[in-house]
């Protein structure tokens, strides 16, 4: 049963670093009323959501006004952003929003992170980039 006291937002770049994004979102839904993405690239968010079968309640650009609007739209007791940067993002208001670095949140929740050096998707992308460079 979802908690009605929390909204969780993931930066797209952060959730992409998890080994099983769908499982992470499903688990986050156990704790939160609303779960969504913050990203500047709507197309990438749509592709990511489709490929990983992720249902999101919202998707916004990373601006202070958008994040403040989320707080007004989802009137939960807590609003949490999980991101990849060590420092709190500039767009995140100091009040009413908590910030957790993905590595810390993953450790606390038991989520596995991708090994970016050996991920099959990363290996394929790297190989494909080399192929295209050799053709030019």
Model-derived features: where do they sit?
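Substrate-recognition "cap/lid" segment bordering the active-site pocket of phosphatases
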Residues: 40-79
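Structural recognition of the conserved hydrophobic beta-strand(s) that form the central parallel beta-sheet
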Residues: 34-39
């Amino acid at each position: 049963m979802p908690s009605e006291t929390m909204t969780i937002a993931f930066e797209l770049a952060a959730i992409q670093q998890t080994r099983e994004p769908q499982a992470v979102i499903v688990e986050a839904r156990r704790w939160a009323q609303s779960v969504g993405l913050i990203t500047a690239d709507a197309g990438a968010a749509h592709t990511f959501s489709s490929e990983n079968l992720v249902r999101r309640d919202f998707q916004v650009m990373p601006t202070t006004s958008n994040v403040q609007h989320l707080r007004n739209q989802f009137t939960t007791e807590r609003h949490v952003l999980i991101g990849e940067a060590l420092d709190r993002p500039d767009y995140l208001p100091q009040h009413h929003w908590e910030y957790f670095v993905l590595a810390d949140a993953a450790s606390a929740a038991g989520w596995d992170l991708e090994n970016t050096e050996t991920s099959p998707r990363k290996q394929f992308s790297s190989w494909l980039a080399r192929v295209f460079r050799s053709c030019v």
